């Protein structure tokens, strides 16, 4: 039995869960609505205040889908109640971010500012010029948007300049030491 998959998911008050044919699960909460279609073989049971995921047999594919399905449903419930957020930090001289309407404008040492439009269901905030907060109800989309922002200027190992996640630790490298004094 999957250790994660066998745990029931508690549904908080104010959240409605609806299971339709072909394992289409719709979770509605205070922050919004999420729908996702799961593998038709997985058995999803929606009870009064909890959701239980079971697998049809002990085949390897079902064992791997068991924990995955349970975690995805849990992330949907968590997203519509609390939402998800990722914080990014910008390090570097002259590197900064600012918000213009629904656009995020990044000045990252290129010859032009990098503009990024907020996708549907995602909000970006800039509380300080060197900090970006990405918020949303879908954990996967929040992570993708944060990764796309980070991709615009990856952190480099010598000076640590670039965009990094708040919790990320950049392994620093030593600069070149040889060559001084040679002619």
From Swiss-Prot:
GO terms for cellular component: cytosolic large ribosomal subunit. One of its GO terms (molecular function) is rRNA binding. Coiled coil: none annotated. GO terms for biological process: cytoplasmic translation. Signal peptide: none annotated. It comes from the Bacteria. Keywords: Ribonucleoprotein, Ribosomal protein, RNA-binding, rRNA-binding. Belongs to the universal ribosomal protein uL6 family. Part of the 50S ribosomal subunit. This protein binds to the 23S rRNA, and is important in its secondary structure. It is located near the subunit interface in the base of the L7/L12 stalk, and near the tRNA binding site of the peptidyltransferase center. HAMAP family: Ribosomal_uL6_B (MF_01365_B). This is Large ribosomal subunit protein uL6. The lineage of its organism: Bacteria, Bacillati, Bacillota, Clostridia, Eubacteriales. The gene is rplF.
């Amino acid at each position: 039995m999957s250790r994660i998959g066998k745990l029931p998911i508690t549904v908080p008050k104010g959240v409605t869960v609806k299971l339709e044919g072909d394992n289409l699960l719709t979770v509605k909460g205070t922050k919004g609505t999420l729908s996702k279609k799961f593998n038709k073989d997985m058995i999803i049971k929606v009870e009064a205040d909890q959701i239980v995921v079971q697998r049809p047999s002990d085949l390897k594919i079902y064992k791997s889908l068991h924990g995955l399905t349970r975690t995805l449903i849990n992330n949907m419930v968590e997203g519509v109640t609390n939402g998800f957020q990722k914080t990014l930090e910008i390090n570097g001289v002259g590197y900064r971010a600012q918000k213009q309407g629904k656009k995020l404008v990044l000045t990252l040492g290129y010859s032009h500012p990098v503009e990024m439009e907020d996708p549907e269901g995602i909000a970006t905030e800039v509380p300080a010029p060197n900090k970006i907060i990405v918020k949303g109800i879908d954990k996967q989309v929040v992570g993708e948007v944060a990764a796309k922002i980070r991709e615009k200027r990856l952190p480099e190992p010598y000076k640590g300049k670039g965009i990094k996640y708040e919790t990320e630790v950049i392994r620093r490298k030593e600069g070149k030491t040889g060559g001084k004094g040679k002619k």
